[in-house]
Regions:
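Specificity-determining recognition surfaces
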Residues: 109-110
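DNA polymerase processivity clamps
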Residues: 1-103, 116-191
Length: 191
């Protein structure tokens, strides 16, 4: 697999790996070998990310978090060779080789949990990030929640705290379908 492709997949999914969860199978990155390529997925029980090929699953493994972070550091350019055995995985990129044991467990059925997008709003990514950051300044320090109201060509972002301080931001959007939902702002910013 091209190094840039694997590194990109790790960057798009690695943030969702659990750190020290008692459900040990969440403390890593699930890598599936599929008929048309590979797919990566990760979840910490609150958020989930996956990307890659969509063909039939031929093999599925869970690589520990520390090994994934080390792999992403060693991958630079060229091609990456991934060798999988029953108990471990070896990743080779140029002169660098990393070997680790696999996590023995069953990764959650992420495809069943995935939300199909029936509500869509298209906006400028940086404007949304900036609006989320500004609105979250006055959010509850413990929960850091923001409310998004999507409608009529705009995304309204609001937050508040126990002292009745409130913040509101509006981001222009297109192709909006109405939706009102509350989110932990950190999860939105990570995505």
């Amino acid at each position: 697999i091209p190094a840039e492709e694997l590194r990109g997949m790790i960057e798009r999914t690695g943030f969702a790996m659990a750190v020290a969860d008692v459900r040990f199978y969440l403390n890593g990155l699930m890598l599936e070998v599929r008929a048309d390529g590979i797919r990566c997925a990760a979840t910490d029980g609150h958020r989930m990310a996956y990307c890659g090929a969509s063909g039939d699953v031929l093999r599925s493994i869970i690589i520990p978090r520390k090994a994934v972070l080390e792999m992403s550091r060693m991958i630079d350019s060229g091609d990456v060779q991934i060798s999988i055995s029953d108990r471990g995985v070896r990743v080779t990129c140029g002169a660098s080789v990393a070997t680790c044991r696999l996590i023995d467990g069953r990764f959650p059925n992420y495809e069943q949990m995935a939300v199909r997008p029936d509500t869509i709003a298209i906006c400028n990514r940086q404007e949304l990030i900036d609006g989320l950051r500004r609105a979250s300044v006055l959010s509850n320090e413990k929960y850091r929640g923001v409310k998004l109201e999507i409608s009529h060509g705009a995304i309204a972002i609001t937050s508040g705290n126990a002292e009745n301080d409130a913040s509101s931001e509006v981001v222009d959007a297109t192709q909006c379908t109405d939706l009102t939902a509350a989110w932990k702002v950190d999860y939105l910013l990570d995505a």
